[in-house]
A protein has these predicted regions:
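Core alpha/beta nucleotide-donor-binding catalytic domains of modification enzymes
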Residues: 2-174
Length: 174
């Protein structure tokens, strides 16, 4: 979507100036059928167009959720973070960047409030955390390196991200 596309474009533009390499990773959750197939093909094509390495994987989140006794949303999150952590370890990355934005943050805080979370839950997502075993499904292999999960767009609104995409002629899949 616009968030991930904008983040990838921003990072690829910054990469020549700063000491980091990019590797694009995309997890197909096995939920949205052919639409999700097209999403993964589009991400792979975008990575190739921009000369970036790509790793994609397909999983069956509904089956994982049933087997692990999780909601589909939680199973998808754990599968995604486990996949990103494994790819990061494989390519010897120190960080994984995800495209959560200010609108996602507001939604998270509101959901936590409505569920009766205490003050810690009301703080929302942090801009940087260490990926740990509690982020992954139980069958995720152990990752033997410290990998940070960073959210560079956490203070940026979705409307600003969409404006960025328009300004830079990016056409994200919606």
């Amino acid at each position: 979507g616009p968030d991930s596309t904008a983040l990838l474009d921003i990072l690829r533009r910054l990469a020549p100036t700063f000491p980091f390499n990019l590797h694009v990773a995309h997890l197909h959750h096995g939920i949205r059928g052919e639409e999700a197939d097209r999403d993964m093909a589009w991400v792979a094509h975008l990575a190739e167009t921009w000369g970036l390495p790509f790793t994609g994987k397909r999983v069956d989140v509904p089956t994982i959720a049933e087997k692990e006794g999780l909601s589909e949303e939680e199973a998808a999150r754990q599968a995604r973070y486990g996949f990103l952590g494994l790819v990061a370890a494989e390519v010897k990355a120190d960080s994984v960047a995800v495209a959560h934005n200010a609108d996602d943050q507001a939604e998270t805080v509101l959901m936590h409030f409505l569920r009766g979370a205490g003050l810690a839950g009301l703080r929302g997502m942090l801009p940087k955390i260490q990926l740990g075993a509690y982020h992954f499904l139980g069958n995720t292999p152990t990752i033997d390196r410290n990998i940070a999960l960073i959210r560079p767009l956490l203070g940026v609104s979705r409307s600003m991200i969409e404006a960025y995409c328009e300004t830079h002629d990016l056409e994200p899949r919606l």
